[in-house]
Swiss-Prot record:
Originating organism: Haemophilus influenzae (strain ATCC 51907 / DSM 11121 / KW20 / Rd)
GO cellular component, one term: plasma membrane
Protein name per its UniProtKB record: Putative membrane protein insertion efficiency factor
Transferase as UniProt keyword: no
Entries under HAMAP family matching the protein: UPF0161_YidD
Pfam families: YidD
Amino acid sequence: MAETHSLGTKILIKIIRLYQIMISPFIGARCRFVPTCSCYGIEALKTHGLLKGGWLTLKRVLKCHPLNAGGFDPVPPKTNNNDEKK
């Protein structure tokens, strides 16, 4: 069954895809992480939705700079809030 995402989530995913298609090929591979920041952003938005996924994406992009070594940094799994309160 196909997942449904909010309009805001879909718009942000489209913006990231436009970046991947129209800008990224011209500036080359610069991301210090695996998965790349743009792939991370799409996965975070699909997994966690607009607010949390957007926040995770913003934090990840801000970490992607020459002073950070980078490395493997996957999107955290979605947790059930009810389980955390027990």
